[in-house]
Amino acid sequence: PPVRREPISLDRFILLKGIPAGISLLLLSIPYGMTTNYVAMYAKQIGINATTGFFFTFMAIGMAISRIFSGKIVDRGKITQVISAGLYLVVFSFFLLSACVYLISWNNMVCTIVFFSVALLLGVGFGIMFPAYNTLFVNLAPNSQRGTATSTYLTSWDVGIGIGMLTGGYIAEVIITPQ
């Protein structure tokens, strides 16, 4: 007798209850994709003379610091508060990063300090947000769909980063440096 297989359905690949959170995560990972790929170009364009590779070092330090305390807060059931705090910190950091274009003409050293401080703050912000999102997705799913929940989380993350890289490349090529 033929083997009976369940029909393929969307809910085997994407956690339907997690779509709103997935859209939110996708939108948050767009600036992450832009920043991690084009921040060195931005620094060079505005005139920051420091080694921009340290930006990623400070970002990694911020992520490491965030892991010390954010997991404990999430374990106490404050997932949305952790995500909100990370979001506010990231938005504030991006405003500071955009201010560097004006700070550089005032004081190069202050601008460089702000630039690397932004990296630290972005690391903390993203470092507390993204693991909290993973917990959120897993908590939304029944035990039988935890793999689907993780798939939805990672798909949202990857698509957002991809859109961020494409958009950042377009901005860098067409808008910032027109021929």
Task: Pin down the residues of each PLM region.
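Juxtamembrane intracellular "pre-TM" segments in multi-pass secondary transporters
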Residues: 2-25
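A membrane-interface helix-boundary motif in multi-pass transporters
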Residues: 170-179
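Loop-to-transmembrane helix entry/capping segments in MFS-fold secondary transporters
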Residues: 49-50, 143-153
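Helix-to-loop junctions at the C-terminal end of transmembrane segments
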Residues: 66-79, 172-173
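Intracellular juxtamembrane helix-capping segments at the cytosolic ends
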Residues: 39, 128-141
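Extracytoplasmic gate region of multi-pass secondary transporters
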Residues: 17-56
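C-terminal ends and interior cores of transmembrane alpha-helices
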Residues: 89-108
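Cytoplasmic membrane-interface "Motif A"-like loop-to-helix N-cap segments
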Residues: 76-88
